[in-house]
Curated annotation (Swiss-Prot):
Site (Reactive bond for trypsin): R16, S17
Protein name: Bowman-Birk type proteinase inhibitor
GO cellular component: extracellular region
Entry keyword Disulfide bond: yes
Free-text function comment from the UniProt entry: This inhibitor has two domains, each with separate antiprotease activity. 1 mole of inhibitor inhibits either 1 mole of trypsin or 2 moles of chymotrypsin, stoichiometrically.
Disulfide bonds: C8-C61, C9-C24, C12-C57, C14-C22, C31-C38, C35-C50, C40-C48
Region forming the signal peptide: none
Record's keyword terms, sorted: Disulfide bond, Protease inhibitor, Serine protease inhibitor
Similarity section: Belongs to the Bowman-Birk serine protease inhibitor family.
């Protein structure tokens, strides 16, 4: 669906196995749109990370640019 198309990840780690097992390790106020297993802590703002694993990585978000715009 659209959630998978819009999902993105800046930092994706994969195992060397075939097929690889990949996980997005981005930390943010929410998980990407296609995440099924999102874990957040209770800080303010929350720090969330997706624990889904896939055989691929999502495209990069370039979230660092967006974060700079929000901070200024």
């Amino acid at each position: 669906g659209d959630d998978v198309k819009s999902a993105c990840c800046d930092t994706c780690l994969c195992t060397r196995s075939q097929p690889p097992t990949c996980r997005c390790v981005d930390v943010g106020e929410r998980c990407h749109s296609a995440c099924n297993h999102c874990v957040c802590n209770y800080s303010n703002p929350p720090q969330c990370q997706c624990f889904d694993t896939h055989k691929f990585c999502y495209k990069a978000c370039h979230s660092s640019e967006k974060e700079e715009v929000i901070k200024n």
